[in-house]
A protein has these predicted regions:
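Alpha/beta enzyme core
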Residues: 6-14, 29-55, 60-79, 88-177
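Short, Lys/Arg-enriched N-terminal segments with co-localized hydrophobic residues
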Residues: 1-3
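Short, basic, glycine/proline-bearing loop/turn elements
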Residues: 19-22, 146-147
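Short catalytic-loop micro-motif centered on adjacent basic/acidic residues
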Residues: 22-26, 84-85, 106
Length: 177
């Protein structure tokens, strides 16, 4: 019986041990969130609910998102692990999600020079882990569009990846072109 948000690291460790994948699906309204949670329950599958900063604003703010998801977990009797994850967040967005009650954050510092990305990531790792959250960081640009911003995609330097990974992040998004 879960009915509460789960740290994404714990769920992914179990997935690796059990040789299965965990999907992350980005949400932007009640209907999508409800559909994803009911499907995860029916399939007995853990799930990560991703929220972009734009979607968080659209839904009324991060406190609203956390309240909606927690309410659905309880009212729909969701009995599988669920993580609520900020997707491609800014420093400010990460801090807001930590305070609002997200269980996981992703800091996208890929547009900063490496030393600045490392400094900001290190601070966020300490804050996130102190509150029991998992944290993902990015090195190199992941191609695609997020909230109207188009990333061309670039290959991350393996040495830079190691430098950021060694900061204690739980997951690393590395640009591969």
């Amino acid at each position: 019986c879960y009915h509460m948000l789960t740290n994404a690291t714990e769920m992914l460790i179990k997935a690796k041990e059990g040789h299965y994948a965990v999907g992350q699906f980005n949400i932007n309204n009640l209907e999508w969130t409800k559909a994803i949670l009911l499907t995860a329950k029916e399939l007995k599958s853990p799930v990560i609910l991703g929220v972009s900063e734009g979607a968080g604003k659209y839904m009324g703010g991060y406190d609203v998102v956390v309240g909606m998801v927690n309410g659905l977990l309880k009212d729909l009797d969701i009995d599988v692990p669920v993580a609520l994850h900020l997707d491609h967040g800014t420093v400010e967005g990460c801090y807001k999600c930590i305070e609002a009650g997200f269980s996981s954050i992703m800091f996208d510092g890929s547009h900063y020079p490496l030393d600045e990305n490392v400094e900001k990531t290190k601070e966020l790792v300490a804050k996130a882990h102190a509150k029991g959250l998992s944290i993902e960081a990015e090195v190199g640009s992941i191609g695609g569009e997020e909230d109207g911003v188009v990333g061309m995609g670039e290959c991350a330097d393996p040495n830079e990846c190691k430098q950021v990974a060694d900061l204690g992040v739980d997951f690393l998004a590395a640009g591969i072109g």
